[in-house]
């Protein structure tokens, strides 16, 4: 999830608290973005950059899933910063203490030789401890980076299209009454959160197979479903968007042109229904306003 806004605290940028609600976020974004709108500052490139960052902050905080992911990463960064500050303070204290002891040692001409040896031994011990602390810190940072990488892989990203997270499932028509929405969800939800399940409605007797499209929330979930052993009633499971191939020879499992057209029509119908629902929600919201 590394991006141009990683070093910016979105809450500070919008001037809001961490527990701010959607209404507060929207109000703060609207007020600040109007101030830095490029149309009002045509000769100030920094204003355009600030306006862009405000839009990124608003998009990240207004979306529940993106805000949850951002808060998790932000908390980890703050915790890491506090640990680094504590480590630097501890190391500085150790160095200051060591220098003070050395100063006392060299200022005191009456100290015996064995006292100097003892202090030198302690110096080596402190250096060893400092090296151990540094190794521990490096290990923690490496572990946190790996955890952050795993979290990013599980976070919904606009860079991964819905098509890339979609799989196509095919089963024989004789199982049409058994393989339904509930059946598919019970099996494939075990691989991760499902965004949508679309099943072919018009099943012609001439058709040998029935199709379904499942859209996962993450690419890794779709990948797991593709590579898992398929249930007995399922004929095959493939990517909806097939990988590029240099071979022009069709295989036994290749989707025909007609099959792909049916799948495309299913997706278009589903998109149309979603758009209708969205328009109805907007109309209801306008009437209630």
From Swiss-Prot:
Residues 129-148 have a biased composition (Basic and acidic residues). Its main location: cytoplasm. It is found in: Cytoplasm; Nucleus. SUPFAM superfamilies: Chaperone J-domain, RNA-binding domain, RBD. CDD domains: DnaJ. GO terms for molecular function: nucleic acid binding. GO terms for biological process: spliceosomal complex disassembly. Residues 129-161, 269-289 are annotated as: Disordered. One of its GO terms (cellular component) is spliceosomal complex. Residues 9-74 form the J domain. Keywords: Chaperone, Cytoplasm, mRNA processing, mRNA splicing, Nucleus, Spliceosome. The keyword Cytoplasm applies. Involved in pre-mRNA splicing. May be involved in endoplasmic reticulum-associated protein degradation (ERAD) and required for growth at low and high temperatures. Belongs to the DnaJ family. Belongs to the 40S cdc5-associated complex (or cwf complex), a spliceosome sub-complex reminiscent of a late-stage spliceosome composed of the U2, U5 and U6 snRNAs and at least brr2, cdc5, cwf2/prp3, cwf3/syf1, cwf4/syf3, cwf5/ecm2, spp42/cwf6, cwf7/spf27, cwf8, cwf9, cwf10, cwf11, cwf12, prp45/cwf13, cwf14, cwf15, cwf16, cwf17, cwf18, cwf19, cwf20, cwf21, cwf22, cwf23, cwf24, cwf25, cwf26, cyp7/cwf27, cwf28, cwf29/ist3, lea1, msl1, prp5/cwf1, prp10, prp12/sap130, prp17, prp22, sap61, sap62, sap114, sap145, slu7, smb1, smd1, smd3, smf1, smg1 and syf2. This is Pre-mRNA-splicing factor cwf23. The gene is cwf23.
């Amino acid at each position: 999830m590394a991006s141009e806004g990683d070093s910016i605290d979105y809450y500070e940028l919008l001037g809001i608290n961490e527990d701010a609600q959607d209404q507060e976020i929207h109000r703060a974004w609207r007020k600040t973005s109007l101030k830095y709108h490029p149309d009002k500052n045509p000769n100030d490139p920094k204003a355009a950059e600030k306006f862009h960052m405000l839009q990124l902050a608003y998009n990240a905080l207004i979306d529940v899933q993106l805000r949850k992911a951002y808060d998790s990463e932000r908390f980890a960064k703050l915790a890491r910063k506090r640990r680094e500050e504590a480590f630097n303070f501890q190391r500085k204290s150790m160095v200051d203490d060591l220098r003070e002891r050395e100063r006392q040692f060299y200022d005191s001409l009456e100290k015996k030789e064995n006292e100097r040896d003892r202090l030198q031994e302690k110096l080596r011990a402190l250096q060893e401890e400092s090296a151990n602390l540094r190794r521990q810190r490096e290990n923690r940072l490496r572990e946190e980076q790996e955890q952050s990488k795993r979290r990013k892989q599980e976070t919904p990203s606009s860079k991964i299209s819905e098509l890339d997270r979609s799989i196509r499932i095919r089963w024989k028509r004789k199982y049409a009454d058994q393989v339904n929405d509930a059946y598919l969800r019970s099996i494939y939800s075990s691989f991760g959160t499902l965004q949508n399940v679309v099943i072919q409605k018009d099943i012609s007797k001439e058709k040998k197979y029935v199709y379904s499209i499942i859209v996962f929330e993450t690419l890794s979930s779709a990948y797991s479903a593709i590579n898992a052993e398929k249930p007995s009633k399922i004929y095959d499971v493939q990517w909806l968007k097939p990988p590029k191939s240099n071979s022009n020879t069709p295989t036994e499992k290749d989707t025909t042109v007609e099959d792909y057209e049916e799948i495309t029509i299913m997706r278009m119908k589903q998109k149309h229904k979603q758009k209708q629902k969205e328009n109805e929600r907007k109309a209801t919201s306008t009437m209630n306003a």
